Swiss-Prot record:
Pfam families: CcmH (PF03918). Heme binds at C42, C45. Keywords: Cytochrome c-type biogenesis, Heme, Iron, Metal-binding, Periplasm, Signal. GO terms for cellular component: periplasmic space; plasma membrane. Belongs to the CcmH/CycL/Ccl2/NrfF family. GO terms for biological process: cytochrome complex assembly. It comes from Rhodobacter capsulatus (strain ATCC BAA-309 / NBRC 16581 / SB1003). This is Cytochrome c-type biogenesis protein Ccl2. The gene is ccl2. InterPro entries: C-type_cytochrome_biogenesis, CcmH/CycL/Ccl2/NrfF_N, CcmH/CycL/NrfF/Ccl2_sf. Gene3D superfamilies: Cytochrome C biogenesis protein. One of its GO terms (molecular function) is metal ion binding. It is found in: Periplasm.
Amino acid sequence: MLKRLLLLLVLATPVHAVQPDEVLSDPGLEARARQISQVLRCPVCQGENIDESNAGVSRDLRLAVRERLVAGDSDAQVIDYIKDRFGEYVLFEPERRGANLILYWIGPAVLVVALGGIFLWLRGRRREEEPVPVLSAEEEARLKDLLKD
C-alpha cells in the first residue's frame, strides 16, 4: 500500500523539461530564466510553456533565454528578442495595444451589449402585458350565481 502511494506521489509531481545541462550556475540568473520560460509559449505545442515542453524548439528557446541573460540582457530585452524571432504567438499574454486591444475589449463589450439587450427585452415585455379587466357589477352577480350552482 505504501509503495502504491509513493508511486502515485512520484507520478503526480510536475515534470519540468529543463535538462541538467541547461541549468545556469548562478541561481539568480537561473531563477530569472525559469520565470521568463514560464511566460513564453512553445511554438509547436498547444498551451505549453517552453519551461515544460520537451520539443526541440523549446530547448533551443530555453538556451537562447539563458544566453541572453548571461550576456546581460534584462528580462524585457530577452522576451523582446524571442518575440522578434517568433512573433507575438510565443507570448502567453499578448501585449495590450493595436489589434490586440480590440480583442481584449470585445468580450466585455459583447457581454455589456447582451445584458443591455436582455434588460430592454424584459422591460418591453412588462409593458406589453395587458391588465386583467375588472368585472362589472352585473358580471360579478352573474359569476356568483354560477358558482352557487
